[in-house]
Regions:
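Membrane topogenic/interface segments and analogous intrinsically disordered interaction regions
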Residues: 1-303
Length: 303
């Protein structure tokens, strides 16, 4: 009886199996390369810290300038409350820019670590997957920067009030030139923002990274579908539950009581999840087609 020949891809992959120690060595190598890429990107970004801070402060400055033109606020400004705060904020800004700048290297190193466990036909997806991952991550950050942050700071600055008046009873009822009168003093004060560099950068960077990570959802579910862990039908049946989960996650993950950010994240998650179903359909179709082609080759070799 003739035994069916092993698929060439499986033979090659069996030869490439690594012991656990080699997996650890490979992980250290990929982490080292990612960290080196991030350090170089951070140093380059720090050289442009001034323009970068002006860029990241633009959503706040635009909202503040509009309120200032309407007479509700003084000209925009930011303060720092400790000697090292400005330096630390600019360094963290350079690090954040370095993450986006080095994201092609980081995603490529991640793929290089995962790829030894994949067949050759799946490895051919490396470059498209890296490109799409980078575009989704950067696209999520841009979505937050263009649509979420301006509305967020317009909403927060709306709590300011240039002339909030109160009446304080200072002396009470007194006799003045033979007459009983109520002596009161009306005081007026303003509620104005005094935003520190650290607080602004903390909220802004959190939203940028959060939306960047959320936009990776189609890639994550697409890879799970390619590995056979999830199916398009299962994802579609879970859709109505995911919509609820998406808006709850938006309320939990978005900092503060930022309603605009919560709705934007919930809506973005819902759209991305449905896009992921389409990606899973394509991945499943490609996998079935490749399996059918491999089976045909195996049958041909067995004859």
């Amino acid at each position: 009886m003739t035994m069916p020949a092993a698929r060439p891809e499986e033979t090659v992959e069996d030869e490439r199996r690594m012991p656990f120690t080699e997996h650890l060595s490979e992980l250290r190598l990929r982490l080292r390369n990612s960290v080196l890429g991030l350090l170089v990107a951070t140093m380059v970004s720090y050289m442009f810290r001034g323009p970068l801070f002006a860029l990241i402060a633009r959503p706040l400055i635009q909202a503040w300038s509009e309120a200032s033109r309407q007479g509700a606020l003084p000209p925009p400004e930011m303060v720092f409350t400790s000697p090292v705060e400005a330096f630390m904020v600019l360094f963290k800004l350079a690090l954040l820019a370095g993450v986006f700048l080095a994201s092609p290297i980081i995603f490529h190193q991640l793929w290089q670590f995962v790829s030894p466990g994949l067949y050759d036909r799946e490895k051919r997806l490396a470059l498209p997957l890296v490109i799409v991952s980078v575009l989704l991550f950067v696209g999520g950050g841009l979505f937050a920067y263009i649509f979420v942050l301006p509305k967020a700071y317009e909403y927060f600055l709306g709590y300011s009030d240039p002339s909030m008046g109160i009446i304080r009873d200072v002396l009470g009822r007194q006799e003045l030139w033979g007459h009983k009168v109520d002596i009161r003093i009306t005081e007026s004060f303003a509620i104005k923002p005094m935003i520190t560099m650290d607080e602004y950068f903390g909220l802004t960077s959190t939203l940028l990274l959060l939306f960047g990570a959320v936009f990776e959802l189609p890639m994550l579910l697409g890879m799970l579908a390619m590995l056979g862990i999830v199916s398009p039908g299962g994802l579609w049946r879970f859709n109505r539950y995911f919509i609820l989960i998406a808006f709850v996650a938006g309320a939990v993950l978005t900092p503060g009581d930022l309603v605009v950010g919560q709705l934007a994240m919930g809506g973005a998650l819902t759209v991305l999840y449905n896009l992921s179903i389409g990606v899973a359909v394509i991945m499943g179709w490609r996998k079935r087609r490749a399996a059918a082609a491999a089976a045909a080759v195996g049958e041909e070799a067995a004859r």
